[in-house]
Amino acid sequence: METYLPFVDDAAVDQAFEAWVDELVEEECGAMPSEGYHPEVPRVMAAKGRDAESGGIDLARYNDAGDVRLLKIVDSYLRHAEITLRELISKTIVNQWVISNDCQQSASGVMQAGIDKLQGQLDALEKYRRDVQVRYRRTHPDTVDASCMRLRDMYI
């Protein structure tokens, strides 16, 4: 049985259980009509054997018994990261917090200014529309009333 998680999967799987599962899969696949398969299924099934030959992930890449020089570089980097997190972050976190809050307030102020400007434009447009309608009604009282009557008759 091939395993994908060698440190987690139990290598001592009962062979009878594995055979039973394979038998169930074959039984289900045999019950399906073969004309229902996609034309690429046989090619993919044939390629499955090639996957086992490729070997999967190269575990040697993660082996720590490698080049001593490289291990020293990695150790130095990890030590630097640990010191940075332990020593410097605790001293600078308050300043980082203040700077972040200032940026957030600045962005919020810019957004609010844009919203206020748009609201002012909408209010001015509404006032203009109201003034135009009032002026038109004063200069054309018969037309406006007739239009309103037609609309009322249409919807009532």
From Swiss-Prot:
Give an example GO biological process. RNA splicing
TM region positions? none
Superkingdom, according to UniProt? Eukaryota
Write the signal peptide boundaries: none
Major subcellular site:
nucleus
Q: List the disulfide bonds.
A: none
- Can you state the subunit structure given in the record? Associated with the spliceosome.
Functional description taken from the UniProt entry: Involved in pre-mRNA splicing.
UniProt-recorded name of the protein: Pre-mRNA-splicing factor SNT309
The species is Candida glabrata (strain ATCC 2001 / BCRC 20586 / JCM 3761 / NBRC 0622 / NRRL Y-65 / CBS 138) (Yeast)
Gene symbol? Answer: SNT309
